[in-house]
A protein has these predicted regions:
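N-terminal Rossmann-like NAD(P)+-binding domain of SDR-like oxidoreductases, especially those catalyzing
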Residues: 1-173
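Short, solvent-exposed loop/helix junctions and linker helices
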Residues: 6, 90-93, 183-187, 222-225, ...
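Short, flexible, glycine-rich and Lys/Arg-enriched loop motifs at helix boundaries
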Residues: 38, 168-189, 199-220
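Short alpha-helix within the catalytic core of nucleotide-sugar-dependent glycosyltransferases
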Residues: 152, 190, 229, 233
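C-terminal substrate-binding subdomain of Rossmann-fold SDR/epimerase-dehydratase oxidoreductases
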Residues: 195-327
Length: 327
């Protein structure tokens, strides 16, 4: 396939680009480089631009004869979205609309969309399946759900097929330790734990230890970035074979607590990793994990890496690159 990858110089995007190239696909990365890194994609063709720039999008697709689109480009800080909702709706929703229309006009008929488990909000039952209620609780989650809805109408009205992949908690790094999440912008638990391990963070805040979970701390479904990358490749293959749209959860189907993460990270790194119990954050659910049976059955996808590999690769990346790609 010949694929345009927006946000392809970012964390999940760059790992997906590497996998697609390794299997023989031709890839062009389209990225604003606000948060992306050239070092993460090597010699992959890169176009620096904004998804709202429809003439540029159409030119890139036409010049390279691209037939598929994977759309990662988005802001993703749920907390910030509560302070700056307009920023998220403008970039994530309006930017996506401009991109999809330009891609459609340029002849693209397959789209893989980077969605999120945040579209579900606080689950009433576990595990979370694709038909669970959709109640996003912040503008970030709402923006992703709106894009999913747009894609359904692009399919109905234009025949543009799409697969939305609802990720759970992305984590981990490349197996060689040479690519991972930029530690300067992280807000998720595992990279924050690693920042503390390398001395770039004084201590890890543990938000609540009185949840109805085995050790009282929050439980989440952590999925390795390489397994997410594989899910995108499988989604492209699914559309090429079946010519229809769908939505899939990408998670391991298992939850891990904050204290479990800390214990394993301390053992792996050999560092103390100071942590402090602080009050719960409003709206944080006690536990979240995926029902991934649909992706397993329909896509033939299954996670290959567990929590140990997530922590091992995260530590290798952060220990070798405590400031990310910054020299």
């Amino acid at each position: 396939m010949r694929i345009l990858v927006t946000g392809g110089a970012g964390y999940i995007g760059s790992h997906t680009v590497a996998l697609l190239k390794a299997r023989g696909d031709f890839v062009v990365v389209f990225d604003s480089m606000e948060l992306g890194h050239r070092e993460a994609i090597g010699d992959t063709p890169l176009v620096v631009g904004n998804t709202r720039d429809q003439p540029l999008v159409k030119q890139v697709i036409g010049d390279h004869k691209l037939d598929s689109l994977i759309h990662f480009a988005a802001y993703k800080a749920a907390g910030e979205s509560m302070q700056k909702p307009a920023k998220y709706f403008d970039n994530n929703v309006h930017g996506s609309l401009c991109l999809f229309e330009a891609a459609r006009e340029a002849g693209v008929r397959r789209v893989v969309f980077s969605s999120t488990a945040a579209v579900y909000g606080t689950p009433k039952t576990l595990p979370i399946a694709e038909d669970s209620p959709l109640h996003p609780e912040n503008p970030y989650g709402e923006s992703k759900l709106l894009v999913e809805q747009m894609l359904r109408w692009f399919d109905t009205c234009h025949g543009m097929r799409s697969v939305a992949l609802r990720y759970f908690n992305a984590a981990g790094a490349a197996l060689d330790g040479q690519n991972g999440e930029d530690p300067r912008y992280v807000q998720n638990l595992i990279p924050l734990v690693m920042k503390a391990a390398v001395g770039r963070l004084a201590k890890v805040a543990v938000f609540g230890n009185d949840y109805p979970t085995p050790d009282g701390t929050g439980v989440r479904d952590y999925i390795h970035v390489l397994d997410l990358a594989e899910g995108h490749a499988r989604a492209l293959d699914f559309m090429a074979k079946h010519d229809r749209s769908d939505v899939f959860n990408l998670g391991t189907g298992q939850g891990s607590s904050v204290l479990e993460i800390l214990k394993l990270a301390r053992a792996t790194s050999g560092k103390e990793i100071p942590a402090e119990i602080v009050p719960r954050r409003p709206g944080d659910p006690a536990a979240v994990w995926a029902d991934n049976s649909k992706a397993r059955t329909v896509l033939g996808w299954q996670p290959r890496y567990g929590l140990k590999e997530i922590i091992d690769t995260s530590w290798a990346w952060h220990n070798g690159h405590p400031d990310g790609f910054v020299k």
